[in-house]
């Protein structure tokens, strides 16, 4: 009882939990962020190129994968800032506006990725379970409208991050979206994030992928290879969801529940759970690597397009090289020809032509007759 009272008095005098174990997670965060950036950037660039080829072939699912890769690229562009932040012992020294934009992109990336995974599952579910009914109803235009709506909705929901505290105590020595302890408003928002951003989408994923498994078992129109592809895609979606997003949201809701029950003394718990929270944060970041590797490179059509584009690039390169070599040889021959013609012109200038010789002879004859 005395410890609780003492803790409550201490919490009234401070607004930030002291002695958070930031240094313990420094190496892990910097390493994971660096690896994700080094692998995720080229992988998502490749994904966007390959899925853009699929979009040109009127593949509906390519719209969602292409949007997912663009979302990941946007988040990956902020990772160098997070690396600097962690190396500076969690002191954000790049200005309040940069913190807001970076945090906004982080939150939007998580929930846009989750919703796009749901879109991919629902699209596969409709295409397989309602194959006849969905003909002519699944189109790229509808997919684009859905993606635009999701982007706009998530952006609007997270727009309050731009109205955070305008004048923090020390702009050059502040944390960036790391609130220890939580406040009532943020804890309530975390519950909403868990329900609408994780629990409901996860329920949709389980339902649609269960129906997909049932449909592929009884389907006679799909080959064994096609059935395996559909199953792998469904398994990949669930695995990504469980590994990358589930742990982060579970810890998020645990922190919020504990704060609601122990508002006067939550700092000791925050310090104890921080290392676990950091590991799960790294898992959510690894989603930027998992998406392109599992969704695009495993796909047979995309892989064929990749090799086809590589062969086409090599063919065009060889044609370009041969054309350059041909032009070079032609240029050399032309220069040699022009050089030879120049030499002949110089020699012709030195040797008198026939008309000049005839005129000389005529003038000599006239002089002889005159004498």
Regions found by a protein language model. Give the residues of each.
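Class A GPCR helix-loop hinge within the 7TM core
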Residues: 110-148, 211-215, 296-303
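Intrinsically disordered regulatory tails of 7TM GPCRs
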Residues: 1-20, 264-266, 300-371
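Internal alpha-helical transmembrane segments of multi-pass membrane proteins, especially GPCRs
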Residues: 66-69, 110, 144-148, 192, ...
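Hydrophobic alpha-helical segments of membrane proteins
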Residues: 77, 156-163, 199-206, 237-254, ...
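Extracellular TM2-ECL1-early TM3 structural module of rhodopsin-like
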Residues: 22-34, 58-120, 127-137
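Intracellular effector-coupling site of seven-transmembrane GPCRs
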Residues: 179-182, 194-198, 213-251, 263, ...
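Extracellular N-terminal segment of 7TM GPCRs
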Residues: 1-46, 181, 190, 369-371
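Loop architecture of class A 7-transmembrane GPCRs
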Residues: 8-22, 86-111, 130, 136-144, ...
